[in-house]
Amino acid sequence: MVGYSDLKGNPLWVVYKLTPPQENAPHLKRPDNFSADWRNLGLITSTDYTNSGYDRGHMAPNHAIALLYGKEAQQETFLMTNITPQRASLNQKIWQRLEEIELESFAPKFKVLWVYTGPLFDLKTTHLKSSYFVDIPNAFYKIYVGLEASGAIKVLAFIVPQNAKANDRLQKYLVSIDEVERRSGFDFLHQLDDKIEDALEKEIDTTSWF
């Protein structure tokens, strides 16, 4: 599920569900091309990123979605409405590491793992030199909501800046969900009871995760 902004040329939030991957799940070939999304009024295309100095960064990850949901779902991760500008040093290093950990380490700990992710912007934003219609985020967030077999809910959140170093420890970028909400303007766990929501959103507890 994607919440897309035509004004920023970015997905503002993306939600996907992870479950423990099956050992015999097929590893699908990565699609060759990114595709424009006809629902996008600005019709951002892959060429908007050409020679921009930024990678076409997936929010819903190609590998995990392909592994769990198959080829058609994988191809949807290559729609430009799932793509945001990421520095190569982020996209191909620490962000990729976080995507690997969420699938291989976090998901097996829970019955179901929900992931909320998206870009964060400064008040004064710049756009790609190759496209006036695509704003450049200064950071990205990930919120994990894990449902245990007992029914207990565990949460974890990160904000990772564009200039994060490849060998940084992920724990360096741990934040509360409250902090993600403050910077994004979104209310992520509003469907929960208010007391439970308040308690989960202010905590930074890695006990069930690392």
Region annotations inferred by a language model:
Residues W38-F210:
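Domain-level detector of nuclease and nuclease-like folds
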Residues M1-R56:
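Short, His- and charge-rich active-site/binding loops that engage polyanionic ligands
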